Amino acid sequence: MARPGDEHRGAECGARGGGWGGRDIEPGRTGELMKIGIIGAGNIGGNLTRRLTALGHEVSVANSRGPETLAALAEETGATPVTVARAARGAEIVVVTIPFKKVPDLPAGLFDEAAEGFAVIDTGNYYPRERDGRIAGVEDEGLTESRWTERHLGHPVIKAFNGTYAQDILDRHRPAGAADRMALPVAGDDAAAKKTVRALIEELGFDTVDAGGLDESWRQQPNTPVYGLREGVDAVTKALTEASPTRPEAFRG
């Protein structure tokens, strides 16, 4: 099983699903249709593309290799493959789901043409020994992972999906009120953006728990009790309170 928030594999790793553009749209959806840009088409990005198009949202998806490499995902889902520089154009929500170390490589002016009041979701995790190498902002300055990402992006971010198994996005969504409905922690400082993101997650079929501001988002980083937890609101709330701010040795660079 891939680790939670495993965003670095290709989109072909996800299961196939429905979409818009001549494809079936899931019945019983709630909320307004939105334009959503997804930067990263790995496990998380690919499966969010599948589910969001199935719900009727207009999705643009980009990766580092170019839109021509996303033809299969586009054909499957009806999403529009674009360059990274165009992914946020007109978007009301932008999902950044790329390897942590690649965040500084995103183009300047990425959000210049995003919709007014847009929200940014950060799904990333810092894996210094496996992939990312040592990053001083996290190791020396003590920034939370998403605070570091926010500084590079130059826009407030909402941390979500970083502890979610990608396949669960496809397989474990449930109607509101279902006894086995999973809850996901959501952290961030921008109250309006957090409200938007929580509503989207709930539409995707998961409850949400407010995990506090971005400086508290260490509570949902890798190797914390909530990371990878497949439980409901009460268990997720408890797990967040049990987290330690000390970064585990295995997750230090």
How should each PLM-predicted stretch be described?
Residues 6-8, 24:
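Intrinsic-disorder-associated, low-complexity terminal segments enriched in Asp/Asn/His/Tyr and depleted
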Residues 29-76:
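NAD(P)+-binding Rossmann beta1-loop-alpha1 motif at the extreme N-terminus of oxidoreductases
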Residues 78-121, 125-132:
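Rossmann-like NAD(P)-binding element
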Residues 81, 156-162, 209-213:
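General beta-strand structural signal in soluble alpha/beta enzymes
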Residues 124-167, 172-175:
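Rossmann-fold NAD(P)-binding glycine/threonine-rich loop
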Residues 179-253:
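Active-site-lining helix/loop region of Rossmann-like oxidoreductase modules
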